[in-house]
Amino acid sequence: MNSTLKVCINAIGYVVVFALLQVIMQYPVSAIYAYCMDVPFSLVINWVTIRPIELINEVIIPSTICAHILSIALFLLLKWTPISTRYISKKPYQVLGLIVLFSLFLVLPLAGIYELMGIEMDKNIEMLFNTMMQKPFGIIAVAILAPIVEEIVFRGALLRILLEYFSGSKAWIAITISAVTFGLFHGNLAQAVNASFLGLILGWLYYRTKSIIPSMVLHLVNNISAVVLTLSFSSDSDIKVVELFGNNLPLAVGCLTVSALLAFGVFMLIRKKI
């Protein structure tokens, strides 16, 4: 088998396996719920497909958590994502601290850009995610497990294998492919654009450090920030960025500009240190 075909099969296989696990795990969880509630299994599956928000506590969140944990175990045990302590043994705490700052400074500028682009999430999907993030186990699934498993799959496995083929000056091809795949995996335009852009940064961090720890830290901070913002403004999910500054447009633009400049400055520091 030539190297190109091997890379393609492995890359596609990683994504397909991860996607299938997200779907497949809904069936045993739905079966358990159907048995406990003494309702037809087919009816539960229909609810999950048509009205998932009605079973968010009973099926959606448990199946998501199970799928994430199973994916982590599978990718690590099969060594699709190799485990190494090489990076953490260097005690890169300063870099990781800078990555946390970078992620925090990036939140508002990106929100402003997406708002200007007119990118809005489908209302049903938005309602589902907002509801999940108001549940304790939903927060664990979205803010903690999702960043961990997605870094293991999309950087530790997918990008790793792509970099074996697209090496050197072609590394950006691998980073772009993994970022776009990561974006498309989210299944809606709003998240696809956001995740693809984030995926470029996450991929670059992995490429420079050969470790998923830096990208995982950034991803965790990003998702936790999203949860905090959602919970802070849960009563008004359609709030605009300018409203965070009392509808004072000059103040909003100024703060977003300063935040963007700080993010760029921190990024340049990270670039020098890795």
Task: Tell me the role of every PLM-derived stretch.
Residues 220-274:
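C-terminal membrane module of polytopic membrane proteins
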Residues 18-79, 98, 254-255:
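Alpha-helical transmembrane segments in multi-pass membrane proteins
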Residues 73-83, 205-209, 264-273:
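Structural signal for the C-terminal ends of transmembrane alpha-helices
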Residues 7-22, 97-106, 177:
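Alpha-helical transmembrane segments
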